[in-house]
């Protein structure tokens, strides 16, 4: 019964060939290149329009003042010479006695300055909350435990004072 119903339905459907203009515009598979190439077009960077750019900084004092973080204290190590600062390597800065955090900061700004990537400004140091990410849970737990202990001692002191006044009879 089902076969006859199905076969009669199939016979009644007339399939018509569909012609499309798309089939003529699609390239054949053999014409697609198998090797992908990198773009050789120049990358368009945002133009730096600030006054704190490479063209406006001519001495090391100005540079160190603009980048902030008390970098001006290293001015004497470079003899206040911008070219000496720009040619100094990380190993030489380490031998001069510049600590790691400040050295990395100076090197990062030197790279940005030479390539004119960003206006000179101070990148503020982040502030740790609750002792930093790794110790946050223990610091919060200790703080809450101390608060509970202080609250318990305060309550015990209030009860003792109330008992001395005669407000509590035990």
Swiss-Prot record:
What is the top-level taxon of the source organism? Eukaryota
Q: Does the keyword Transit peptide apply?
A: yes
Query: Its principal location?
Result: mitochondrion
Q: Could you tell me the keywords of this UniProt record?
A: Mitochondrion, Ribonucleoprotein, Ribosomal protein, Transit peptide
The cellular location(s) given in this protein's UniProt record come to: Mitochondrion
Can you list the disulfide-bonded cysteine pairs?
none
Report the GO terms under cellular component.
mitochondrion; ribonucleoprotein complex; ribosome
Q: What Pfam family is a match, any one?
A: SAM_Ribosomal_mS41
The organelle targeting sequence, given as a residue range = 1-20
- Alphabetized InterPro entries for the sequence: Ribosomal_mS41, SAM_Ribosomal_mS41
Q: What does this protein do?
A: Component of the mitochondrial ribosome (mitoribosome), a dedicated translation machinery responsible for the synthesis of mitochondrial genome-encoded proteins, including at least some of the essential transmembrane subunits of the mitochondrial respiratory chain. The mitoribosomes are attached to the mitochondrial inner membrane and translation products are cotranslationally integrated into the membrane. mS41 is involved in telomere length regulation.
Protein family membership: Belongs to the mitochondrion-specific ribosomal protein mS41 family.
Instruction: Outline the subunit composition.
Output: Component of the mitochondrial small ribosomal subunit (mt-SSU).
Q: What is this protein called?
A: Small ribosomal subunit protein mS41
């Amino acid at each position: 019964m089902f076969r006859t119903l199905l076969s009669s339905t199939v016979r009644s459907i007339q399939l018509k060939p569909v012609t499309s203009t798309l089939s003529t515009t699609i390239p054949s598979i053999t014409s697609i290149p198998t090797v992908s190439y990198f773009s050789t077009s120049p990358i368009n960077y945002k133009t730096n329009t600030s006054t704190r750019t490479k063209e406006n900084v001519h001495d090391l004092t100005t540079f160190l003042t603009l980048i902030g973080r008390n970098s001006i204290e290293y001015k004497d190590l470079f003899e206040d010479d911008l070219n000496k600062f720009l040619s100094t390597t990380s190993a030489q800065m380490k031998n001069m006695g510049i600590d790691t955090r400040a050295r990395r900061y100076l090197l990062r700004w030197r790279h940005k300055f030479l390539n004119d990537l960003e206006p000179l400004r101070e990148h503020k140091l982040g502030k740790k909350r609750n002792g930093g990410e790794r110790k946050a849970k223990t610091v919060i737990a200790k703080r809450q435990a101390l608060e509970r202990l202080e609250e318990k001692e305060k309550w015990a002191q209030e009860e003792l004072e109330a008992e001395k006044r005669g407000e509590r009879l035990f």
